Amino acid sequence: MIKKVSILNSNFIGVYARTWNDVTFLPVNISDEEKRIFEETLKTEVYKISIGNSFLIGSMLSMNSNGIVVADHGIDNLKSLNINGRNILSINNKLNAAGNNIIANDHAALIHKSFPDSIRKKIEDVLGVETVKGSIAGIKTVGSVAVLNDRGMLVTSEADEDEIKYLSDLFKINVKTGTANFGSNYVGASIIANSNGILVGEATTSIELGRIDDTLS
């Protein structure tokens, strides 16, 4: 299932929410109707949380089946939730917007080039996958220009063929380029997807929807 939606009147829904196949995190000030759309489309447990004083849950949190990486002021809000045994790492670093700076699945993680090696190792341990530093089309905030699930990975249309092959080999998944929200290359900020469903910003065109659906469904 693929559906258009906005969060808090924004089409950049990926900065507000984060999902995996079993759990979804949304900001506390989302409406009950918006929450219901996420539950029905993504088919997961849905929790409304805040991370510090921020509602930008998608920007502040990254996860896979093994672990969660979150900004340093967000860990207490997660400990009381049913997160299916995941490890939790809080990042006390200027790059603590984990959702913007990390893209991960159950095979690998790609992280911002400027993470120190000590934090790279901690991320690797918590997510339980090979973790490498890099960028996508020159963008260091890799989580903002990529989105993935078990079926595929969509990255900014500015990524070249060598990058697409590298990402496909790294994440062991089919990778395609595309846009959302009427031409935005920030697909990670515009799309929320797991293996059960896909949500996209309301400005996404029918052509973009087809590409997204073809990649992630």
Curated annotation (Swiss-Prot):
The keyword Transcription does not apply. InterPro entries: eIF6. GO terms for biological process: cytosolic ribosome assembly. One of its GO terms (molecular function) is ribosome binding. SMART domains: eIF6. Keywords: Initiation factor, Protein biosynthesis. Pfam families: eIF-6 (PF01912). The keyword tRNA processing does not apply. Belongs to the eIF-6 family. HAMAP family: eIF_6 (MF_00032). PANTHER family: TRANSLATION INITIATION FACTOR 6. Binds to the 50S ribosomal subunit and prevents its association with the 30S ribosomal subunit to form the 70S initiation complex. This is Translation initiation factor 6.
